[in-house]
């Protein structure tokens, strides 16, 4: 029993010694990197005065740009009609999250970074840290929701267009904010290592409890990062496949268009022959109305030689047929038909001198009926194909631009937040890792910069947002 008790006491002493060493190491890191600098303002600073002034200016500009940019995004969606669509409510939610970061989190962080000590009390510290976790988590989860929305819209556009209702979007946004609250609230409920009493030199920092660090970093960053990586890769593959399918469809339609042009020539030749015969019969009906002495003369003038319908084209038909041709024909066929019209008009002018106006009226009433095509012309089909292809091209261009914008947003998100969350996850398990306050402040503000960069990304890569921003800022488009 005595040996057992001695063994237990030895283990307890070792544990206490280890904890004391860890605390001493942390305190040593804090003391070694905690110099104070006097200033002309009568307060001590964590950095030299010139550095404090420069830091304050830079960080204040970041805060102002974050506030202004995200307010412009919110106003653009609600005031500019092309942006007033359901899926843009995700962007509004993201802008609200970034705006709360700029208003509730960043100003206190500026003061804390420059002063090097927390002077606002323990309760403000707890609320500030909770808002920090919740708002940053909401910003990241909103990016994840936007990625999922784009993924469903591209991979299943028909079904998802019916499912993407305002209620569904608002439900997803609500889930994002509820999850953010769940991830950020445990420290307020006791899952923390905060001191009970704050001294002037007591740091206000995120809890380093290993369990909470793993829980919060996974929910706030690592799980959304995995989801966005997989989703964006699927979006890339789906967009690439659709572009490849469109290229194949374009080749097929080009070949089909060429075949239609060839068939159009044959059909035109056959229709001319039928029209010639029909017009010949009509001309015979016309010649019965005149006297027998003029019958042979009129028959010679009205009887077609090669293409008789060209000789029965009055001047009044010129404008009428020119209005029809651009609709029924493509660019190449307009030139050919234009030449035929010139020949027909010339022939009409020469024949109108030798025939009576009444005869022309009677012939003109019958000729258009005989030359009318009951089936749609191949040129009409080609125009329809071109219209559909153009609509598909515009749609795919928008999808590709949206996917590219999403990829840039995700890339900026990773660059901004990955350093912070790597350090945040490593520190609780590495007591001997001494990091300077300047480095910690840098990676923390690098993450905050993500809230300022999102509106800039929209402005650069989205034409509608650019127009809306210019309209809100009273700039000429």
From Swiss-Prot:
Annotated region (Disordered), positions in chain: 256-317, 334-358
Extracellular side: 1-55, 111-127, 192-216, 428-439
Compartments where found: Cell membrane
Biased composition (Basic and acidic residues): 263-272, 279-295
Nucleotide-binding in keyword set: no
SUPFAM superfamilies listed in its UniProt record: Family A G protein-coupled receptor-like
Spans traversing the lipid bilayer: 56-78, 89-110, 128-148, 169-191, 217-238, 406-427, 440-460
This protein's record includes keyword Glycoprotein: yes
Any single Gene Ontology cellular-component annotation: plasma membrane
Topology feature Cytoplasmic, residues: 79-88, 149-168, 239-405, 461-477
Membrane topology per record: Multi-pass membrane protein
Extent of Basic residues compositional bias: 296-312
Superkingdom of this protein's organism: Eukaryota
Glycan-modified residues: 11, 16
Keyword entries, A-Z: Cell membrane, G-protein coupled receptor, Glycoprotein, Membrane, Receptor, Transducer, Transmembrane, Transmembrane helix
Any one GO MF annotation of this record: octopamine receptor activity
InterPro entries: GPCR_Rhodpsn, GPCR_Rhodpsn_7TM, Octopmn_rcpt
Family: Belongs to the G-protein coupled receptor 1 family.
Main function: Receptor for octopamine. Octopamine (OA) is a neurotransmitter, neurohormone, and neuromodulator in invertebrates. The activity of this receptor is mediated by G proteins which activate adenylyl cyclase.
Protein name per Swiss-Prot or TrEMBL: Octopamine receptor
Organism: Heliothis virescens
Lineage of source species: Eukaryota, Metazoa, Ecdysozoa, Arthropoda, Hexapoda
């Amino acid at each position: 029993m005595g040996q057992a008790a001695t063994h237990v006491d030895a283990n307890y002493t070792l544990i206490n010694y280890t904890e004391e060493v860890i605390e001493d190491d942390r305190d040593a890191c804090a003391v070694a990197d905690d110099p104070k600098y006097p200033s002309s303002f009568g307060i001590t600073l964590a950095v030299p005065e010139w550095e404090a002034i420069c830091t304050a200016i830079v960080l204040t500009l970041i805060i102002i740009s974050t506030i202004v940019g995200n307010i412009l995004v919110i106003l653009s969606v609600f005031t500019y009609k092309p942006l007033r669509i359901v899926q843009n409510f995700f962007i509004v939610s993201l802008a609200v999250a970034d705006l709360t970061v700029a208003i509730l989190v960043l100003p206190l962080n500026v003061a804390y970074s420059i002063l090097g000590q927390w002077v606002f009390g323990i309760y403000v510290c707890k609320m500030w840290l909770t808002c920090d976790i919740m708002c940053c988590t909401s910003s990241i989860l909103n990016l994840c929701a936007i990625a999922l929305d784009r993924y469903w819209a591209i991979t299943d556009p028909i079904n998802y267009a019916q499912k993407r209702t305002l209620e569904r979007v608002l439900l997803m946004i609500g889930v994002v904010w509820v999850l953010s609250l769940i991830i950020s609230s445990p420290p307020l409920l006791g899952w923390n290592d905060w001191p009970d009493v704050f001294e002037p030199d007591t740091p206000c920092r995120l809890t380093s409890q290993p369990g909470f660090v793993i829980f919060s970093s996974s929910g706030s960053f690592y799980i959304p990062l995995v989801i966005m990586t997989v989703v964006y890769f699927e979006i890339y593959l789906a967009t690439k496949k659709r572009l490849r399918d469109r290229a194949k469809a374009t080749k097929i339609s080009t070949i089909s268009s060429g075949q239609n042009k060839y068939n159009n020539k044959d059909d035109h030749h056959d229709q001319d022959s039928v029209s010639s015969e029909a017009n010949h019969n009509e001309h015979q009906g016309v010649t019965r109305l005149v006297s027998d002495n003029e019958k042979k003369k009129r028959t010679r003038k009205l009887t077609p030689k090669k293409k008789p319908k060209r000789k029965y084209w009055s001047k009044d038909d010129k404008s009428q047929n020119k209005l029809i041709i651009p609709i029924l024909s493509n660019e190449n066929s307009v030139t050919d038909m234009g030449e035929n019209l010139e020949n027909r008009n010339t022939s009409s002018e020469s024949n109108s001198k030798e025939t009576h106006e009444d005869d022309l009226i009677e012939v003109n009433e019958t000729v258009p009926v005989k030359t009318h095509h009951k089936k749609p012309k191949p040129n009409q089909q080609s125009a329809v194909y071109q219209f559909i292809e153009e609509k598909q091209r515009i749609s795919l261009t928008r999808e590709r631009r949206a996917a590219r914008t999403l990829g840039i947003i995700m890339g900026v998100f990773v660059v901004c937040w990955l350093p912070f969350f790597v350090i945040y996850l490593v520190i609780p398990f590495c007591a001997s890792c001494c990091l300077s306050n300047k480095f910690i402040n840098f990676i923390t503000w690098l993450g905050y910069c993500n809230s300022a960069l999102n509106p800039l990304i929209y402005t650069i890569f989205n034409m509608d947002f650019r127009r809306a921003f210019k309209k809100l800022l009273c700039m000429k488009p």
